[in-house]
């Protein structure tokens, strides 16, 4: 082997000429204590609140407690390999998530990393998960309807775009079912949906995703999932991440629906973090700022004014109660933050009234302005009839002789309750809801046996679609029942009743 000194010399010269001194300065600290997903780090003097910190092995943490001599940090991933004395690096950025069209149809974790095995999410746009809610000037009052496709809700507890409507009830009362039905009903509208699953079983989330796929709803939906097996910090971050993804679309002038399922588990995760970080506990051991935890999230739902693009973000937070106790700490907090609540009762659920909406306790504080006029016309008497029915039903149990007017009200009420029942995953277009409720409140169902009410409704709507499609079309486009339209609808119902046996 021949050594050529001149060649070696030229290579060394070249290397020296190309050599660039690169000094990378990064602020580092040392782990002084770690355990239970929490690390205390010494030496990060310039650390920001909510800043991402990098632990050995690429695991990220988030600075939550900035104390005099150390930083209390929650670890967003596996922490068993982290030990005392490890070096922690500052990243200089706060927690942010990828946003944009690339996320639609995907299942991601609260950091925006894909969970569905469909490859990486290609987007160059990121948003911080926390941000200040839109101010008074940038907002507009809620005035457009967001149809859920559920008769009991669209008629009596209407939801508008930009509203925050709480869904509250015990476990197994159909809270998630209402949210999923609402998402399915946004098909063929311009609404982008985001379903945030917080602390649920992975199998439950998989089932929800499959249901959405089966109904073609994943084409306009993003699922953000922090399952029960994920670390508490991810459960805490999930709603904010979902909201940040929605805000990107809202600021482009689009309409977004975000479901937080459920915020009770987020509050429990935050309580866990706060206690581990040694923050002082308050009522029910929740930290003092648990109200702010939910208020700063739900205040980000808004209807933007036309100068800001006119987009909207509607929030449907879900809260699980224990044995119907709506006066517990978290339920009362969220009730006071939202613009109304849909209260689901287990007694109604077990009695076969599904969706199990308690119409007396449920309310929508702003949705009335968003309801279409035709629905307002038929639903006004519906609420009254049901209220009178509930009052009289209590007396009727005593079995005393009842006069004709009372009997008529009881008869009408029974049929209205029956009409408001609805199968899961079968949301109904608003014009069909109007026609069905119109028939009920005008007494066309009073002479039918209760068990015939649902078959009557199904056959009647089929008859209307086949023979009088223009009536439904007119209700949908004009949104009002004129005298002429009312008389046409009445004659159509009478014509159908003759054929219905």
Swiss-Prot record:
Belongs to the ATPase alpha/beta chains family. GO terms for molecular function: ADP binding; ATP binding; proton-transporting ATP synthase activity, rotational mechanism. One of its GO terms (cellular component) is plasma membrane. Keywords: ATP synthesis, ATP-binding, Cell membrane, CF(1), Hydrogen ion transport, Ion transport, Membrane, Nucleotide-binding, Translocase, Transport. Produces ATP from ADP in the presence of a proton gradient across the membrane. The alpha chain is a regulatory subunit. ATP binds at residues 169-176. This is ATP synthase subunit alpha. Its EC number is 7.1.2.2. It is an enzyme of class 7 (translocase). It catalyses: ATP + H2O + 4 H(+)(in) = ADP + phosphate + 5 H(+)(out). It is a peripheral membrane protein. Its main location: membrane. The gene is atpA. It comes from the Bacteria. CDD domains: ATP-synt_F1_alpha_C (cd18113), ATP-synt_F1_alpha_N (cd18116), F1-ATPase_alpha_CD (cd01132).
């Amino acid at each position: 082997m021949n050594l050529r000194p001149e060649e070696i010399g030229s290579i060394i010269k070249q290397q020296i000429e190309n050599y660039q001194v690169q000094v990378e300065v990064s602020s580092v600290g040392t782990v002084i204590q770690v355990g239970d997903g929490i690390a205390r780090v010494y030496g990060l003097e310039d650390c920001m609140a909510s800043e991402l910190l990098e632990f050995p092995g690429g695991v990220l943490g988030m600075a939550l407690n900035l104390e005099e001599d150390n930083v209390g940090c929650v670890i967003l991933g596996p922490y068993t390999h982290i030990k005392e004395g490890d070096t922690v690096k500052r990243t200089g950025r706060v927690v942010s998530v990828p946003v944009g069209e690339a996320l639609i149809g995907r299942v991601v974790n609260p950091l925006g990393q894909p969970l569905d095995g469909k490859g990486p999410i290609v987007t160059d746009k990121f948003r911080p998960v926390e941000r200040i809610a839109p101010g008074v000037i940038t907002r507009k009052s809620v005035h457009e309807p967001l149809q859920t496709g559920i008769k009991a809700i669209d008629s009596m507890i209407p939801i508008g775009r930009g509203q925050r409507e709480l869904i509250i009830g015990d476990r197994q009362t159909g809270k998630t079912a209402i949210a999923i039905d609402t998402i399915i009903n946004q098909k063929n509208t311009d609404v982008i949906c985001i379903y945030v699953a917080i602390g649920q079983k992975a199998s439950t989330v998989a089932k929800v995703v499959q249901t959405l796929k089966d109904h073609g709803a994943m084409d306009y939906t993003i699922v953000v999932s922090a399952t029960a097996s994920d670390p508490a910090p991810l459960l805490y971050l999930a709603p904010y991440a979902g909201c940040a993804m929605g805000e990107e679309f809202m600021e482009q002038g689009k309409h977004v629906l975000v479901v937080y399922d459920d915020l009770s588990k987020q509050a429990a995760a935050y309580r866990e973090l706060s206690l581990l970080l040694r923050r002082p506990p308050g009522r029910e051991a929740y930290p003092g700022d648990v109200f702010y935890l939910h208020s700063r999230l739900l205040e980000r739902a808004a209807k933007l004014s036309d100068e800001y693009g006119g987009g909207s973000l509607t929030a449907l937070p879900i809260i699980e109660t224990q044995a119907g106790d709506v006066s517990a700490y978290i339920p009362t907090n969220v009730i006071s933050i939202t613009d109304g609540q849909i209260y689901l009762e287990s007694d109604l659920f077990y009695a076969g009234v599904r969706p199990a909406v308690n119409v007396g306790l449920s309310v929508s504080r702003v949705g009335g302005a968003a309801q279409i006029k035709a629905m307002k016309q038929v639903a006004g008497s519906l609420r009254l009839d049901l209220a009178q029915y509930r009052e009289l039903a209590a007396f009727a149990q005593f079995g005393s002789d009842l006069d004709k007017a009372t009997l008529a009200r009881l008869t009408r009420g029974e049929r209205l309750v029956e009409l408001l029942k609805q199968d899961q995953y079968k949301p109904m277009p608003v014009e069909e809801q109007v026609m069905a409720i119109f028939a009920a409140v005008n007494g066309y169902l009073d002479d039918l046996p209760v068990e015939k009410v649902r078959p009557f409704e199904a056959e009647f709507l089929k008859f209307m679609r086949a023979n009088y499609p223009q009536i439904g079309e007119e209700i949908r486009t004009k949104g009002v029942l004129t005298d002429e339209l009312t008389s046409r609808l009445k004659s159509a119902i009478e014509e159908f009743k003759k054929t219905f046996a």
